[in-house]
Design a protein with these regions (language model features):
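RNase H-like two-metal-ion nuclease catalytic core shared by retroviral integrases
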Residues: 26, 133-134, 156-179, 189-191
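Acidic/histidine-rich, metal-coordinating catalytic segments
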Residues: 126-139, 166
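Extended, low-complexity cationic-aromatic segments
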Residues: 31-118, 216-220
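Generic structural signal for small/hydrophobic residues in well-ordered secondary structure
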Residues: 3, 55-57, 91, 117, ...
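RNase H-like polynucleotidyl transferase catalytic core
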Residues: 18, 75-81, 149-167, 183-184
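Conserved short alpha-helical interface segments
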Residues: 1-24, 50, 57-59
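C-terminal anion-handling pockets and recognition modules
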Residues: 2, 47-49, 169-222
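Short, aromatic/basic amphipathic alpha-helical patches
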Residues: 140-150
Length: 222
């Protein structure tokens, strides 16, 4: 208690930390922010391309996030299933409020990633610049072959270990904070329905999607 009082007097406040991998290369991040991304943005404008930011994530029934209210001195109790199950999704967002997503079974592989790329290609007639992380599946020969045969989508890669630079990461956080622990889930199907309902709600609200780009770490992409 005394330490907390001192911290308050010194101007410190309790805040949710931003996690940063020690493997991250700060020079690569600087290069991305000052050179690489501005070049992508200029090229997109020149070619009439839409820039999207993509990512994969898993939502687990036992994930614990967010807070709940209760009388002072009493810990809130949330009734949830003791079973463990999950739902995997891949999504993409842009700073105009567009949201694309797909639920998939099992781990991400080249076939699943290509299936999502096909969905993106069908969503518009023009060129798409998709910015993603350096997951090996994004660089497989199958993916490269598909991209060569379907030239309307180009992939660009974020600096390694830099999820905080990806606006789509804040969609992932939004889902996990507002699904697990806030809806009753007795099965994987319940979780899947909850995730789809939430994503469709966000898809219908472009202004909410745009807010992901307000975070200080991704404001450069707004």
């Amino acid at each position: 208690r005394q330490i907390g009082r001192y911290l308050k007097e010194w101007g410190f406040t309790p805040q949710k930390p931003v996690y940063k991998a020690y493997e991250q290369n700060s020079s690569e991040v600087t290069q991305w922010l000052l050179k690489e991304y501005p070049k992508i943005r200029i090229s997109a404008k020149k070619n009439g391309a839409m820039i999207l930011w993509g990512d994969e994530t898993g939502i687990r029934s036992h994930d614990q996030r967010g807070r709940s209210f209760s009388p002072r001195g009493k810990t809130p109790v949330v009734i949830k299933t003791g079973k463990h199950f999950g739902v995997n999704m891949i999504s993409a967002v842009n700073n105009r409020g567009k949201l694309y997503f797909m639920i998939y079974k099992g781990g991400i592989n080249a076939e699943t990633f290509i299936r999502f790329l096909k969905r993106l290609a069908r969503s518009r007639k023009g060129t798409i610049f998709l910015i993603i992380d350096n997951l090996p599946v994004h660089k497989t020969n199958k993916v490269k072959t598909w991209l060569r045969n379907n030239g309307r989508i180009q992939l660009f890669y974020l600096p390694v270990y830099s999820p905080e630079l990806n606006p789509d990461e804040y969609l992932n956080q939004d889902i996990k904070a507002n699904i697990v622990g806030k809806i009753r889930m007795h099965s994987q199907e319940d979780l899947k329905k909850g995730v789809l309902k939430f994503l469709n709600k966000r898809k219908r609200n472009p202004q909410q999607v745009k807010k992901y780009f307000h975070h200080p770490k991704v404001r450069y992409a707004a």
